[in-house]
Structure formats: C-alpha cells, structure tokens
Regions:
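Conserved CoA-thioester-binding segment of acyl-CoA-metabolizing enzymes
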Residues: 1-64, 98-101
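Glycine-rich beta-to-alpha active-site loop
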Residues: 97, 101-149, 153, 317
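Amphipathic alpha-helical segments at domain termini/boundaries
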Residues: 1-28, 33, 124-128, 168, ...
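Gly/Pro- and small hydrophobic-enriched strand-loop and loop-to-helix capping segments
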Residues: 130-154, 191-205, 334-336, 340
Length: 475
C-alpha cells in the first residue's frame, strides 16, 4: 500500500494505492462531525484527480467515507452564502462540474460505497462513479433534498440520476425531496449492488474492480427523451397548489428535465443555467433563513434535560398523543384525567400508534409498559415534568396548576400546552411562578414533530432550557 502523493498535506482525504493498483479515496472532512463538501474538500479532490490522471499503473478507483455512520451530507450550504451573485454561483458550479466530469472520464473502472446518509451533493459525487454500492442498513438514505431550500441539484446529479432511473423517478426524487432507502435505490436502478453492512463494502468493491480487469464499463441511458406523460403528470401533481413566484423550484425542475431529457450529460450541464437564479432568488433565501433558524433551535435543544418521568394531565386527543410520543421516546409516562374512559381510550390509541411506528412486538410491549393510567393523579409527585392539556379555560388551568404545585417536586417543571392564554395569567396564582413554562404541541402530535417552547416574565431560564432539551429529546 502506498500513498497517493499530491505534494500537499491533505486535511480532508486519505488516499492510497494498494498492491492491485486500486486507488482508495477516503473522505473525512476535517473539523466536521460528518462529511460535507466544502470548498477545501473540493480543492484537495482536484489535486487527487491530477494524480489519478497522471498515474499509468492504476487498475481502478474507489471512494468511501472515512467517518463511520454516514457517507456525505451534501455541500456546505453556509459556504454558498459567500457567493453573492448568479455569476459567482455559476463559476463555482463550473469548477465542480469540471472536477466531477474528470472523475467520470478516468480510463479505469471506478466505484463508490455508501453506508448511511448520501444526500444532495453527497449523492451527486456518488453518482460520478461507475458502480454504486450501498449497505442494507435502515440508516442508508439517498436523495435530493435541495427543493426544501428552494433549489435543485447543482453538481450534475440531475442528469446522472436521470440516466439511471428515468423521468418519473428523478422528478419524484427532486421535487418531493424524500430520500430513498437502499432497497428502493436498488429497485429503481439508482444503486447497483447491496451488501449487509459497512464492513462488507470494501470487499465487494475490490472484488468488482478486480473483475473488471482494468476495463471501464460502458454506461447506458435509461431513456432517450423525457417521458411526456410523466412530465404532464408531475405538473399536475406538484404545481397545482404552488405559486411559481413563491415556490419556483418545482416548476424549474420539471422544465429542466423536459428540456434535457435527450441527453443525461446535457441535463447535468444544464443545471448551470437554472441553479444560480434559484439560489439567489427570494424564495431560496427565505427557505435558507428558516433552515438556519430551525438549525439554531435544534442546537439549543441539545443536551441532557434530566427528564425521565413525564406526567400528563388531560387525556383528550392532545394530552393522550403527548403521552404516547413521550412513551415512544423512552420516558416513563403517567396519564391522568377525571374521566377514566378518556384515559383508557387514549391508551388504546397509543397502542395503535406504537404498532404502526415501532413494528416489533417487543418494542410495542415495552412502550405500553412505559405508559400507565393514573386515575387518582398521585403520580404527579414523582414526575420530572408535568404537562397540562385540559380545556382552554383560565380558571380550570389555574386550579390544575395550584394543585400540581403542592403535590409535585420542587424541581419539577410545570408546563401548559396552551396556545391562547398568556402564561402570566396562569402563573400569577402560583407561589413559584418561575416553574411554569409553555410547551405547545401541534396537532396531530405524532405527525408534526414541532414543539413551541414559551416562557413568561416569571419563567426560570433553567426550566426553559430543560423544556427545549425535552423537545429535542422526544423529537
């Protein structure tokens, strides 16, 4: 095994050539917990490609992640914010397109192994290689989520994916933004081979490369023109409920596939004429702003809440679903209500939810064991967090919290699910109003993983922080 000498110290790649002449490229983005395609990563890759092109004794090229549990999570979206004009964006794209085209054109066979997440630019770099191996892990996901930021694939992925899967599948991937699991990726042709786990990737890839005997395989294009029926179906499915001026990406994606369906390479190159204007447009800027804000909230929700026991007061739809989601997240949950039938109904609904989500009989049984009826309300005394989800009446909520304050632990968080009544109006009757925060769940709770954390002028900041950590804990 010898290193692939670029004449530079590589921070982001481990590159070597084995005794069979196979060049192994392992990406391990420096300073990041997961792999992302930063400008620095691309620059180093350019130096590596220079060496690959100059090497006369290679028999194949293989790429893997140097970080366990994931492949590549895409481009570094924060770096795109430094590209202020459409011209800046286009120039960056042309550099990456040129780099990826050079890898694709290497005269020896190439392959890539994906275990975990390969989305956005991560999938685009994977599609550059002749053969795509995936693991059967449920964590392996391949997709194009760019539409959620108001853009589309920009590193040639649209054409390369289209060549493999055709009009319908590539439109669904790019417009829905939903990733594919490994089995579905094999089924529709996006991926070529599947192995059990990450440890099997290198063995399978080596075997395939050796079998090629240095001969590059010829790759075909599934369709020679975009399917007009599928184009029309996509317009009907995806554009009926959106305004092009507010959400331009779906229409732009459909037009792009229709215009370049005759040639996958032209479709890849054609991204340079579409992506930059989407990137600098108002819709994408707004969606990226939401992404950054959401990411900041998620980061603030990290940490240990210290909450192990949850008590929910009110077994209606909201209260019952909050209790069920808590039990699914591994908390010990007690559910109280004046109406015993309401509690029993909530637990019956929870059982159906567990069966849909958890699948395994053992996991369903364990979740049900964590969710207990509390017909007399005594379990509030042991709870770390108490969430009230009773009728939206101020006097009712005040009475509930006055009682809870007397029976609960001093360090327990008192939380209301209200979205209509000011917290100060409830907290004003408490001896320790700083214990009260708002945890507003959105309905239906199991479907919408969103919790609004609210505080009053009285709320203790530590209680608020723990409430945010709890939201992250169950989400």
């Amino acid at each position: 095994m010898r290193s692939l000498n670029t004449g530079k110290n590589l921070l982001h790649w481990l590159a070597s050539v084995d005794e069979d002449g196979i060049a192994w490229l392992h990406l391990q983005t420096d300073g990041k917990s997961v792999n992302v395609l930063t400008h620095a990563v691309m620059a180093e890759l350019g130096s590596l490609v220079d060496q690959l092109e100059a090497s006369e004794d290679l028999t194949g090229v293989a790429m893997l992640s140097g970080k366990p549990g994931g492949f590549v999570y895409g481009a570094d979206i924060h770096e795109f914010e430094t590209l202020k004009t459409a011209g800046n964006v286009a120039n960056h794209m042309l550099f990456v397109h040129g780099l990826f085209n050079r890898i694709e054109a290497l005269p020896v066979p190439s392959c890539v192994g994906v275990d975990g997440i390969a989305v956005g630019g991560g999938l685009e770099i994977a599609l550059v290689f002749d053969r795509l191996f995936v693991t059967s892990s449920p964590k392996t996901k391949l997709g194009f989520p760019e539409v959620n930021l108001g853009i589309m694939p920009g590193y040639g992925g649209s054409g390369r994916a289209y060549g493999r899967v055709g009009t319908k599948a590539v439109l669904d991937m790019m417009i829905s933004g939903r990733p594919l699991g490994s089995q579905d990726a094999i089924k529709n042709g996006l991926a070529d081979d599947i192995v059990d786990n990450a440890d099997d990737l290198e063995v399978a890839m080596r075997q395939w490369l050796l079998g090629c005997k240095g001969e590059k395989p010829s790759l075909t294009q599934l369709e020679t023109a975009a399917d007009a029926t599928e184009i029309a179906a996509a317009r009907d499915k995806y554009l009926k409920r959106v305004r092009a001026d507010h959400t331009p990406a779906p229409a732009a994606i459909i037009d792009h596939v229709e215009n370049f369906g005759h040639d996958k390479s032209a479709m890849s190159a054609g991204e340079v004429g579409v992506f930059p204007n989407l990137m600098i447009g108002r819709a994408s800027k707004n969606l990226r702003r939401v992404f950054y804000l959401t990411d900041a909230v998620r980061k603030s929700a990290r940490g240990v809440s210290g909450i192990k026991r949850l008590h929910v007061v009110g077994a209606g739809v909201m209260g019952g679903d909050i209790a069920a989601v808590g039990a699914m997240a591994g908390l010990d949950v007690t559910l109280a209500d004046m109406n015993e039938a309401a509690i029993e109904g909530a637990i019956a609904r929870a059982k159906k939810l567990f069966e849909r989500r958890l699948k395994s009989d053992d996991k369903v049984a364990a979740a049900l064991a964590r969710l207990r009826a509390d017909f007399d309300g005594n379990d509030a005394a042991d709870a770390d967090l108490i969430i009230e989800a009773v009728a939206e009446k101020l006097d009712v909520k005040r009475a509930v919290f006055q009682k809870l304050e007397t029976v609960s632990k001093a360090g327990a968080i008192l939380a209301t699910n209200t979205s209509a009544i000011p917290l100060e109006d409830i907290a004003s009757v408490l001896k320790a109003p700083e214990r009260l925060i708002g945890l507003h769940f959105f309905n239906p709770v199991p479907v919408l993983p969103l919790v609004e954390v609210i505080w009053s002028k009285y709320s203790d900041q530590d209680m608020v922080n723990r409430g945010m950590q709890f939201a992250g804990q169950i989400g």
